[in-house]
């Protein structure tokens, strides 16, 4: 492995480890949780795709992001195994937008399911607002007869979290409220208008 490859692998592992820490770090709200988050295991290795392919995948993913992310709000992350591209985004500026988000682009349905399961692994499941099944299928209003993906609602370190897949775009999206909001119903309403 070249020195550049080693550095890229070390950076990738550090970013994934930081992401796992961020998603599982304790907060004061965790003391009140009845069920602690599931423990995480070792991080996934970084893919070894070429720069051109990674760049094309990154651009494709950024074009598919929900509205409300201004220029510079998202940064590209090294993609874990099975993921073509991944970005970490700061606060969405639309009303009741999430405080933070991670969006992933995958190549196939098996990778979509794996990335979805990884995204929800360190959360505590709840029904979505309105007593909507979680996890469960979701549909677009324009195509109510066709499942668009899977939807999941939960808490990550006491913060409302919505995770969903989009089978057409081949994306997994995980959005999270911050300590000051939005509330779960607000975040769910944002998802409903941005998915």
Predicted regions and their residues:
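A short acidic-to-branched-hydrophobic micro-motif
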Residues: 95-116, 171-177
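Hydrophobic single-pass membrane-targeting/anchoring helices
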Residues: 1-40
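Short glycine-rich, low-complexity/disordered patches
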Residues: 73-80, 127-138
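Extracytoplasmic/secreted proteins, especially bacterial periplasmic and envelope-associated proteins
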Residues: 60, 64, 111-118, 186
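Extracellular/mature segments of secreted proteins
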Residues: 81-84, 96-103, 135-138, 160-163
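Extracytoplasmic low-complexity, Pro/Thr/Ser/Ala/Gly-rich segments
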Residues: 30-100, 188-195
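Extracellularly exposed regions in secreted/surface proteins, prominently low-complexity, repeat-rich
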Residues: 132-195
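Conserved polar/disulfide-associated segments of primarily extracytoplasmic proteins
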Residues: 112-134
